Amino acid sequence: MSLNNQQPPNKLLIAALAASFLAIVGTGGILYYLGIFTPVTITKETTSNYQFAYIPHTGAYSQLQSVFDEADRALSETDISPIARAALLQDDPSLIPEENLRSKVGFILSTHDRTPPGLIIEEIPSRVIASATFNGSPVIGSYKAYSALKEWCVANGFKPRLPALEIYYDDGVVEYQLPISR
């Protein structure tokens, strides 16, 4: 066969290859943005006391957004500026049925702030924690952070305790705090 008799590449094949390439690159970009490739770093530290204003919730941890919305409405009626949104997760979802999971959802406040109407105030005492920070999707972060925290506890001779505290900063970083003991 001579070179003159070869047919030009099929335009449909080229388009399919280009679309496949763009889909792979696009999917990789989305996964990168969500944090799937972001490493989790664990540190051991002692926290300060937190003043926590919250609404109690029972049910799936994946359904906390509506409780955050309710807490946002309560806080918006005041002149209080929270330090950060937060959720205190009281139960282990691998041991407790989803509908019975207990949490407290609200805000970390300055110690001099008054109690916002519609919210309950609790002081979270200083404690020794393993802390993981994650910048990306809270769903992916939750999975990656708690897996890494549990592995770190085992590797370093600590026992993880509850309640876990998740602090959601305005810049998209989530800090996952898990109390630990020997």
Regions found by a protein language model. Give the residues of each.
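A solvent-exposed interaction/effector surface
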Residues: 2-182
